């Protein structure tokens, strides 16, 4: 009886080892495919962008077989927690609020936010300091913005740090209009259906370059505070399924793998190279 039991346990251990190794080598990474130049789609429907190329670089360093899948932004975190995929690379800023439900790798790129208007807007002359880090305080600048945005309709993508900032009260009571994608924000800004928009600065410059529309960045660039501390890979918290379970251990190992790969990609200059290619400047951290 003991011998049979040992054989059965050995079989289970062997099967678990095979399954775990196969599972660990296959990583599904979600991106939105609608936030250029971070991530978008080519005319033939292929996922492209800074994060798509970076994901492939990181997977090569990790030795994992990766599949990049498309996911709507507003369902990004819930689907990760439901194990629809293993990681998120979608221009997702590292914020304290998000860290309550998921974990992040170390940051791989800086993202600064900016307000944008169409040329000729009354807000085009808005002058403030060049850059604002909300973690260090910016009362004077926020007061200026509160006055400037009073009565204006500001467009943002739903579920973003930009929406959270506008609704925080830091710039008074603002008429916020939300959109499912950044593309929709850009189109309504160009059509005059909103007065001003808030998003990553590169999202506006990319749109202006590709569309030829006279989009103008105004006011300061924002970082810190509600805007987070850079962009990283979103991952499940190891404790979500128990740190001692196979799934929990796998999630914990994946975090280590991504951190190691990001450090290598940073040291090798690959992140800088891709950032310059897609953003026009070095946004690596």
Can you say where each PLM-predicted feature lies in the sequence?
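A local structural motif
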Residues: 56-70, 148-153, 168-184, 191-193
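Extracytoplasmic small-molecule ligand-binding "clamshell" domains
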Residues: 24-92, 100, 268
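A conserved helix-loop-strand patch within extracytoplasmic ligand-binding domains
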Residues: 93, 100, 104-154, 159
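Bacterial N-terminal signal peptides
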Residues: 9-19
